[in-house]
Amino acid sequence: YVIKFFVGRSKPKKTKFVISDLDFNDGTHDVHVDHIIINTQGVHVIETENMKGIIYGKESETEWEQSLEHGKLMKKFYSPIKQNSGHIYSLKKKLNTTVPFFSYIVFTKRGSLAVKTVHVPVEYPFAFSQTIKNKKAHDVLNHDQAEELYHAILALKKN
């Protein structure tokens, strides 16, 4: 849903390659990446969450909390920022590239976000589509290089 939302609103002539549900082994761990967008700015790695309730967390924290039943039930879960950071580390390790990687966390609108971050956007789908569309980063790849990186990432996929 998140990627369809973004891709559907993009200009078709821009260089953009999309991979969803990438499973690979980085040599140590099995890794699942929800979505990757490769464009001329680099590699955008998106972790999606579909949680209800109120989500509390800070960028620096390892555990976040999900408040359910009007605060009567609190569930801890691993920070999606830390999780996505691990995905990016594994991708860089396998690809051996200096291309910039960007991290994004996207929650569906089932819940409310009470999250504080500075470097990693934690947003709903519409805000994410605006964030990535308006991303201020230098182009580091041409179309052919972006396509080559796309195929290199696809080659990591477990059969």
Show the residue positions of the predicted features.
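Surface-exposed interaction regions that form or flank ligand-binding interfaces
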Residues: 1-31, 37-43, 49-57, 63-159
